[in-house]
C-alpha cells in the first residue's frame, strides 16, 4: 500500500482543544446508537480515531460542535463500510436503502425501530440543522442527497468490473466521498454562514471543488490496496492506469500531479478573494466569514491528510478484515 507517498500538503495549522472529552462522547454515542458493537468491532472502530480526525479537520470546532463533527465522521465511515459486502454489489438494494436516509433529510424521520445507521444519521442531521441558516440547510440537504444517491452508482461500477473515464469517475467519486459535507460541517462548526454571492462565485466554487478533489484523490492513493482487493472501480489510480495503459508507479505519479494542480489553483484563487469581497460590497463581518471559510477548506485538506496517513483504518484493514469477507464486523444497515 503506498502509504509513504508525499503530496506536499501543509501540516494542520491547529487542532481543536477538548479532544479527550470528544473521544469519550463519541465512543458512548456510537455504542448507544448501535453503530458499533463490542469486541473486535469496537477495537477496530477505536483504532480509526474519528475524534482525532474531527479535531484536526475542524480546528474551529469547540465543545458540542466538535462532538457533532466526530459523530458525523463516525457515521460516514461506518455507513461506507456497509457497502463493502453484498449490498455494495446490488445497485437496486443500495438505492432502496439509501432512499430511507434521503427521506430523513427531507423530513420523514427514522421511524420506530429504525436501524442503527438511520437513527445515527437522524441524530446528526437534527443537531446539524438546529438553529442553522435556511440557506445552509438547503444546500447541505442537497449534498446529503448526492452522497446517498451515489452509493448505487458505485455499486453499478463494481459490477462493470473496469474503471470508467475520468469525468464519470469524478461524478461518482465526489458523491460517495461526501467531502463537500465536511466543508459545510466546518462552516457550521466555525459559527459562520458564507454569503450566497460569495459562496457561488467562480473563485469559491472552484476552490471548494479543488478542496473536495484533493481530499478524495489523496485518499484514493492511500486506500488503493484496500479498495482494489474489494473490487472497487472508483479509484483515481485505477482510472489513470486503465485510461493511459500505464504502470502502477506511473499512475500514482500522475495522481500526485492531479493533486498538485488543484492545490496550486486553490492558492491562486485565494489571492483573488479579498478583491472579490470588495467588488461584492460585503460588510466587514461578511468578509470575515469568507476569510474563515477559506481557513475551513484549508484545514479540512491538511487535517484529513494528516489523519489518513496515520490511521489504522488504511494501514490495518487488509489484516483485520480480509477481502474474502465483508468489510465490517457488524451489519448495521439491514435491507
Swiss-Prot record:
Its EC number(s): 4.2.3.96
One family name in Pfam for this protein: Terpene_syn_C_2
Residues given in the record as Mg(2+) 2 binding sites: 80, 84
InterPro entries to which the protein is assigned, alphabetical: Isoprenoid_synthase_dom_sf, Terpene_cyclase-like_2
Binding sites annotated in the UniProt record for Mg(2+) 1: 80, 84
Reaction(s) catalysed (UniProt annotation): (2E,6E)-farnesyl diphosphate + H2O = avermitilol + diphosphate
GO molecular function per UniProt: metal ion binding; terpene synthase activity
Note in the entry: The recombinent enzyme produces avermitilol (85%), accompanied by small quantities of germacrene A, germacrene B and viridiflorol.
Role played: Catalyzes the cyclization of farnesyl diphosphate to avermitilol.
UniProt name for this protein: Avermitilol synthase
Taxonomic lineage from the root: Bacteria, Bacillati, Actinomycetota, Actinomycetes, Kitasatosporales
Amino acid at each position: 500500500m503506498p502509504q509513504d507517498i508525499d503530496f506536499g500538503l501543509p501540516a494542520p495549522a491547529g487542532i481543536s482543544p477538548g479532544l479527550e472529552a470528544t473521544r469519550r462522547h463519541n465512543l458512548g454515542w456510537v455504542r448507544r446508537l448501535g453503530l458499533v458493537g463490542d469486541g473486535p468491532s469496537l477495537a477496530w472502530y477505536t483504532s480509526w480515531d474519528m475524534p482525532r480526525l474531527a479535531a484536526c479537520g475542524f480546528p474551529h470546532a469547540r465543545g458540542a460542535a466538535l462532538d457533532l463533527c466526530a459523530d458525523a465522521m463516525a457515521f460516514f465511515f461506518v455507513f461506507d463500510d456497509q457497502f463493502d459486502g453484498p449490498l455494495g454489489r446490488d445497485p437496486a438494494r443500495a438505492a432502496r436503502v439509501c432512499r430511507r436516509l434521503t427521506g430523513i433529510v427531507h423530513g420523514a424521520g427514522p421511524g420506530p425501530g429504525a436501524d442503527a445507521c438511520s437513527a445515527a444519521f437522524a441524530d446528526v442531521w437534527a443537531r446539524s440543522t438546529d438553529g442553522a441558516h435556511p440557506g445552509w440547510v438547503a444546500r447541505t440537504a442537497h449534498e446529503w442527497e448526492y452522497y446517498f444517491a451515489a452509493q448505487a452508482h458505485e455499486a453499478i461500477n463494481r459490477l462493470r468490473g473496469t474503471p470508467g473515464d475520468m469525468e464519470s469517475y469524478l461524478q461518482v467519486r465526489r458523491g460517495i466521498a461526501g467531502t463537500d459535507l465536511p466543508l459545510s460541517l466546518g462552516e457550521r462548526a466555525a459559527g459562520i454562514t458564507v454569503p450566497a454571492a460569495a459562496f457561488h462565485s467562480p473563485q469559491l466554487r472552484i476552490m471548494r471543488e479543488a478542496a473536495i478533489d484533493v481530499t478524495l484523490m489523496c485518499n484514493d492513493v492511500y486506500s488503493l490496496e484496500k479498495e482494489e482487493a474489494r473490487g472497487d472501480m472508483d479509484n483515481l489510480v485505477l482510472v489513470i492506469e486503465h485510461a493511459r495503459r500505464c504502470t502502477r508507479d506511473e499512475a500514482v505519479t500522475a495522481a500526485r500531479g492531479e493533486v498538485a494542480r488543484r492545490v496550486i489553483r486553490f492558492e491562486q484563487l485565494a489571492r483573488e478573494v479579498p478583491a472579490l469581497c470588495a467588488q461584492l460590497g460585503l460588510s466587514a463581518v461578511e468578509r470575515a466569514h469568507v476569510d474563515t471559510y477559506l481557513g475551513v477548506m484549508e484545514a479540512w485538506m491538511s487535517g484529513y491528510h494528516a489523519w489518513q496517513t496515520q490511521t489504522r483504518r488504511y494501514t490495518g484493514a487488509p489484516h483485520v478484515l480480509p477481502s474474502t469477507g465483508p468489510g465490517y464486523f457488524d451489519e448495521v444497515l439491514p435491507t
